[in-house]
Regions:
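The feature marks the mature, well-folded catalytic cores of soluble enzymes
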Residues: 1-233
Length: 233
């Protein structure tokens, strides 16, 4: 360390702490950020939607707005109806065991020939059902407008495989849970740290390993949709 200090132009014996660089270690006022989130009006929340759509367009991420669960269910059923399986002719869909997903009533909306699975902690065939499904439906607890990100938290009945394995990932997000930026998200996570693993998802899988050509779907979903549902309309 003494050599590094010398190279950086400091005394070899000078031990520098955080107090020497306050701007690097500035702490965020979590309480103030949470107060801002809690005080955001419904109109202000709706104002975040165009920001999300603008950010998503750069990431090949499709954003849909829905007024209520019925409209959201119709949108999702339409996506499934107009999509084809990538590797198999079987049309299977897997959805999280979540009350918001259940409110979509997809079993009554999907056409004949589409098999709908729901994740369950006691289902021994869950792995095979997930692999066989070309669409995975989740209900992330938070979304971020500025980075077009959804936060997927692993919970009982809500495995991360649903968002990672199927070729198409559809995320159902409540408008009330759409945040402005990552600063707000980190404030939420500091207040309510997840008990299990979680991932930030910003669009479909992307890689440019070969000849610097961008390819979607090599290591995960090739297509992603976020359906933002406004429950006040």
């Amino acid at each position: 360390m003494s050599h590094i200090r010398t190279v950086l132009g400091h005394s070899a014996t000078q031990v520098r702490g955080r107090e020497c660089c306050p701007s690097l270690f500035r702490t965020t006022d979590t309480a103030q950020i949470l107060e801002r989130i809690d005080g955001r009006s419904q109109e202000s929340k709706r104002g975040l939607l165009p920001r999300l759509q603008e950010s998503a367009a750069l990431l090949n991420l499709n954003v849909h707005a829905a007024a209520g669960f019925a409209a959201a269910g119709a949108i999702i059923a339409g996506i499934i109806r107009n999509s084809e399986p990538e590797f198999d002719s079987a049309r299977q869909v897997i959805q999280h065991d979540h009350p918001d997903v259940a409110a979509l009533a997809l079993s009554a909306r999907l056409e004949d020939g589409v098999v709908l699975h729901t994740t369950g902690t006691a289902d021994r065939d869950l792995r095979e059902k997930t692999i066989s499904s070309f669409v995975g439906i989740t209900a992330p607890p938070w979304g971020v407008a500025d980075s077009a990100t959804v936060v997927q938290i692993t919970m009982p009945g809500q495995p991360r495989s649903t968002s990672l394995v199927p070729a198409i990932h559809i995320a159902l997000l409540r408008l009330e849970n759409l945040l402005a930026d990552l600063t707000e998200l980190y404030a939420i996570l500091r207040r309510d740290p997840p008990a299990s693993s979680y991932v930030f998802i910003s669009g479909p899988s992307k890689t440019a390993d070969i000849e610097s050509k961008l390819v979607h779907g090599a290591h995960g979903p090739r297509e992603m949709h976020v359906v933002v549902v406004d429950l006040t309309r």
